[in-house]
Amino acid sequence: MVNALEKIEDGKLAIASSDGQEKRQFLTMRIDSQAFGLPVIKVQDVLRPQNITKIPLSKPEILGLINLRGRIVTVIDVKKRLGLPLDTKPLDKKSKNRMVVVEHKGELYSLVIDEIGDVLDLPLSKFEKNPENLSPIWKDVSQGVFKLKSLLLLILDVENLLKI
């Protein structure tokens, strides 16, 4: 089970805590009503919604491009990508929506999510494969889960999410 996490960490070693358990840090977020975790090492930045330049004839889940400190970033609407109901409110700086910038294969992508959470230190011993009864929508973009006290935290598989 640890191997799946090592894969998404690009071979980085986990940190041993004072109780001897290996732990990794995950940025938590919400997409629709589901809680997700993203390895902190994958996160480049977290932004409030920015001005987006539309790309003519692009796929519906690609909202456009933003300029982040001189680098061009492709903006992905995660809800559209997963076929989930879309928000009726526009994406603006006052909304709770955030843009989580990740790097994948040398390119930057901004994932538009509903809400950002905390950074959690989670023991690798608690990581499990996806449950068999997990919705196919979530299973396709999740590498596995952490069962926390009040929720199931899916670990986002950025590579599968960005297969557009």
Where are these regions (language model features)?
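An acidic, low-aromatic, low-complexity terminal/linker signal
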Residues: M1-I164
